[in-house]
């Protein structure tokens, strides 16, 4: 049952069976209820950090930042960049003590949960899963740290 409640996964990003996201227990619900009081503040903070990233990395050549249409006002859960040089960028950021994550390293059509579709050819999904890199992001991040992270990414882009 735990596996089914966690997207059909025992190991992060490895879906063995089809599952759902049903991990909210009463304690987590109580904590989230308290956090709702600062939701607007956190949303504004996330937007500010995304703006900094967009401004500082927007002219990068080897790094693609999230596209945001003029009319859109995203809330921002993650800040995910794309680069064909993901491992190099991740390594350089790690050397600068900047943690990153890869969301999601295995595309859905290659998960065991969808083994009936594993033979599908989805080259765009395959390419994206090899290029995406999530940068540190959230309301906890200071403006100074956001600037440092973006400038480090930009420097790595120039060296690529």
Predicted regions and their residues:
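PLP-dependent aminotransferase class I/II
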Residues: 1-160
């Amino acid at each position: 049952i735990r596996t089914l409640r966690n997207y059909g996964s025992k190991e992060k990003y490895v879906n063995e069976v089809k599952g759902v996201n049903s991990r909210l227990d009463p304690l987590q619900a109580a904590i989230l209820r308290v956090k709702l009081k600062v939701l607007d503040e956190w949303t504004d903070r996330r937007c500010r950090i995304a703006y900094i990233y967009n401004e500082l990395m927007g002219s990068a050549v080897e790094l693609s930042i999230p596209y945001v249409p003029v009319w859109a006002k995203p809330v921002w859960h993650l800040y995910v960049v794309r680069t064909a040089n993901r491992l190099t960028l991740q390594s350089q950021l790690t050397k600068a003590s900047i943690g990153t994550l890869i969301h999601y390293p295995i595309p859905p059509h290659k998960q065991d949960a969808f083994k009936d579709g594993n033979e599908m050819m989805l080259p765009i999904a395959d390419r994206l899963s090899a290029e995406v890199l999530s940068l540190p992001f959230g309301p906890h991040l200071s403006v100074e740290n956001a600037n440092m992270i973006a400038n480090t990414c930009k420097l790595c882009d120039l060296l690529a």
